[in-house]
């Protein structure tokens, strides 16, 4: 699977053969070239083509129905359009902090820090909050 972390200033791309098994990471500035050209460059740098792969893009911005706009970079993400142009079999576009929130339950108690009183309950709702291009927030 071709995976991408698209931030407001930097984008990171890699191939994942299975969950937790991520290969080399290719970085490039966000928005300096058209999106499709950037994806093609990343695939070339990773030594692969898109035709047999699924892709997931975690983007720094609001996502609705598989679409997102990075207004500061001039990139627009449309999962169906990217799949057709790049011949990916499947494309997912998701908010970057939503991706982090989805992974929180996998961390277990060793990978979390309790803030405030009470007992840590890994099954309880958890919050991700952090700076990036803007202020990212997500709940798991």
Where in this protein do the model-derived segments appear?
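Short glycine-rich, Thr/Ser-proximal phosphate-binding strand/loop in the N-terminal lobe
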Residues: 1-45, 49
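Short amphipathic alpha-helical segments
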Residues: 15-16, 40, 68-70, 105-106, ...
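Short beta-strand-loop/turn "lid" adjacent to the catalytic site in phosphate-handling enzymes
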Residues: 48-93, 98-111, 128
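FAD-binding glycine-rich core of flavoenzymes that anchor FAD
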Residues: 112-116
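Solvent-exposed alpha-helices and their adjacent loops that cap or buttress functional pockets
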Residues: 6-7, 117-123, 128-131
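Short beta-strand scaffold segments in enzyme catalytic cores
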Residues: 11-15, 129, 134-140
């Amino acid at each position: 699977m071709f995976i991408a972390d698209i931030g407001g200033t930097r984008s990171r791309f890699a191939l994942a053969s299975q969950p937790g098994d991520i290969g080399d990471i290719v970085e490039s500035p966000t928005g300096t070239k058209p999106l499709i050209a950037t994806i093609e460059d990343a695939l070339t740098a990773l030594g692969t083509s898109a035709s047999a792969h699924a892709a997931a893009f975690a983007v720094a911005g609001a996502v609705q129905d598989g679409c997102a706009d990075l207004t500061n970079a001039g990139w627009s993400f449309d999962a169906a359009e990217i799949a057709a142009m790049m011949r990916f079999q499947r494309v997912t576009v998701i908010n970057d902090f939503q991706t982090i929130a989805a992974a929180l339950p996998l961390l277990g108690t060793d990978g979390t820090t309790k803030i405030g009183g009470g007992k840590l309950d890994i099954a309880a709702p958890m919050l991700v909050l952090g700076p990036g291009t803007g202020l990212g927030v997500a709940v798991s």
